[in-house]
A protein has these predicted regions:
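Short linear/disordered segments characteristic of secreted peptide precursors
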Residues: 11-13, 20
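Catalytic alpha/beta core domains of metabolic enzymes, predominantly
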Residues: 173, 184-216
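Extreme N-terminal basic, low-complexity initiation segments
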Residues: 2-11
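Active-site beta->alpha loop and helix N-cap motifs at the rims of alpha/beta catalytic domains
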Residues: 47-55, 61-190
């Protein structure tokens, strides 16, 4: 029965000059792209539920390697009590690649029940095999989930066109709101702003991005 703590609610975010430069560059690209490619459809309003601080939940384990549901339950209650705006389950922070399919399903059921509709929920469903990601989305009960968080394909190092085609297939396979996840330090490839904008303008259910490229 290990004690689970999370200091994310107390973390201060400091903006560096590099980050400011990146934001200014992205904003300039957005303005140019919007002018050249006016969007005809409106994004899914689910994105409005995901404003504020979203906490990526870890997966606590016992010494024997099994999931510690008691600790996970305490962690969920802690985040809700400390004013998290929404929860992210089964992301990379949850060590999802190390979980079996049955563990993923059981963890999702547990978090959904424990949350009991108190906060919006985002579920991580991603990978480097497009077909497997789509099959997982279609076979998962998403009735209590507000959006899918899907990471850029890792290890394979796809081209920008390959990244576009990956997310295009996912967006066309579901009506669920999709959050892109760009973390090149982990995946080995950076999704460029132009690719993000292309996807966002062409697919209204792509509603947001978790941008973790930093100084990549």
């Amino acid at each position: 029965n290990s004690k689970v703590t999370n200091k994310a609610a107390n973390t201060k975010i400091h903006t560096t000059n590099t980050e400011k430069h990146y934001s200014q560059k992205l904003f300039a690209i957005c303005k140019r792209y919007d002018k050249a490619n006016p969007k005809k459809t409106q994004p899914d309003m689910t994105a409005n539920k995901l404003i504020g601080m979203g906490i990526a939940l870890i997966t606590p384990f016992k010494h024997d390697g099994s999931v510690d549901y008691e600790a996970l339950g305490k962690l969920i209650e802690y985040q809700i009590a400390n004013h998290a705006d929404y929860l992210v389950m089964l992301g990379t922070t949850a060590e999802t690649p190390t979980l079996t399919a049955s563990e993923r399903n059981e963890i999702a059921r547990f978090i959904i029940a424990k949350n009991n509709k108190r906060l919006p929920l985002v579920m991580g469903i991603g990978g480097n095999d497009t077909r497997t990601v789509i099959e997982q989305i279609k076979s998962t009960d998403l009735s209590h989930v507000d959006a899918i968080l899907s990471v850029v394909p890792y290890y394979n190092k796809p081209s920008q066109e390959g990244i576009y085609q990956h997310y295009r297939a996912i967006a066309q396979a579901t009506n669920m709101p999709i959050i892109l996840y760009n973390v090149p330090g982990r995946t080995g490839v950076n999704m460029k702003a132009e690719t993000v904008l292309r996807l966002a303008h062409e697919f209204p259910n792509i509603v947001a991005i978790k941008e973790a490229s930093g100084n990549f």
